[in-house]
């Protein structure tokens, strides 16, 4: 059975945010505004997304 995937897009700049939030965005593989990554939907990834939910947009892949 294929694992569920989600698409994460950086929609706001990381300028002026906490260093830990910038590190989390980089950990998700996002570099600049409107960059997107398709990631496996795991509890770890969901936790990272929840931490920076004000910076990213999430949709089904």
Swiss-Prot record:
Q: Which InterPro entries match?
A: Ribo_uL30_ferredoxin-like_sf (IPR036919), Ribosomal_uL30_bac-type (IPR005996), Ribosomal_uL30_CS (IPR018038), Ribosomal_uL30_ferredoxin-like (IPR016082)
Source species, domain of life:
Bacteria
Q: Name one GO biological process term.
A: translation
The record's section on Gene3D superfamilies has: Ribosomal protein L30, ferredoxin-like fold domain
**Keywords for the protein's UniProt record, in alphabetical order:** Ribonucleoprotein, Ribosomal protein
Q: Hey, which family's this protein in? A: Belongs to the universal ribosomal protein uL30 family.
Q: How is the quaternary structure described? A: Part of the 50S ribosomal subunit.
Q: What is this protein called?
A: Large ribosomal subunit protein uL30
Q: Which organism is it from?
A: Bordetella petrii (strain ATCC BAA-461 / DSM 12804 / CCUG 43448)
What gene makes this protein?
rpmD
């Amino acid at each position: 059975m294929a694992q569920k995937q989600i698409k994460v897009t950086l929609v706001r700049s990381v300028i002026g945010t906490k260093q830990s939030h910038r590190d989390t965005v980089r950990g998700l593989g996002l570099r600049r505004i409107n960059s997107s990554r398709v990631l496996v939907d795991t509890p770890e990834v969901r936790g990272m997304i929840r931490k920076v939910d004000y910076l990213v947009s999430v949709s089904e892949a």
